């Protein structure tokens, strides 16, 4: 089967749905967090291309602890994996973590075919402390 951008993106998203469904709740993985706030700002390497709008996600204890997020570009088959960033935040006991990730996916850029996505994610992850017992 030949994989085009739509096929590869659909296969990736289906795998992500299965992995998200199998993930433990946030309260089990990281009981020290009452919540996690993830702020995403995107930047394109080409200034002539408009970057996707920023995203804000708040995760509460019952939420599945899955930290892989699809690239917001509709023609891209890549994603951003923040699993290690969240784990490092939990280990550090700091209230926030931030960093940059580059999408490793492929996008259809023009009639010549696919090219690397190169979208950069600038993220901030802020933890809400667990309530006192």
Show where each model-derived region lies.
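Short metal-binding segments enriched for Cys and/or His
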Residues: 38-39, 97-133
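Low-complexity, intrinsically disordered/propeptide-like segments
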Residues: 6, 14-15, 29, 36, ...
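Structured alpha/beta or helical-core interaction and ligand-binding surfaces enriched in interleaved
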Residues: 81-82
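N-terminal alpha-helical interaction blocks
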Residues: 1-65
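Short linker/helix segments within small regulatory modules
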Residues: 61-65, 86-100
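Short cysteine-rich clusters marking metal-coordination/redox-active sites
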Residues: 70-76, 103
């Amino acid at each position: 089967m030949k994989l085009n951008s739509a096929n590869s993106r659909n296969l990736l998203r289906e795998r992500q749905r299965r992995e998200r469904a199998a993930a433990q709740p946030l309260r089990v993985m990281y009981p020290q967090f009452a919540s996690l706030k993830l702020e995403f700002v995107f930047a394109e390497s080409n200034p002539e291309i408009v970057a996707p709008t920023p995203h804000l996600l708040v995760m509460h204890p019952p939420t599945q602890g899955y930290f892989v997020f699809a690239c917001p570009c509709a023609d891209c088959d890549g994603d951003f994996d923040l699993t290690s960033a969240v784990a490092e935040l939990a280990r550090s006991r700091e209230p926030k973590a931030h960093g940059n990730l580059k999408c490793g996916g492929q996008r259809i850029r023009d009639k010549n075919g696919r090219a690397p996505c190169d979208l950069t994610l600038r993220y901030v992850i802020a933890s809400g402390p667990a309530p006192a017992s």
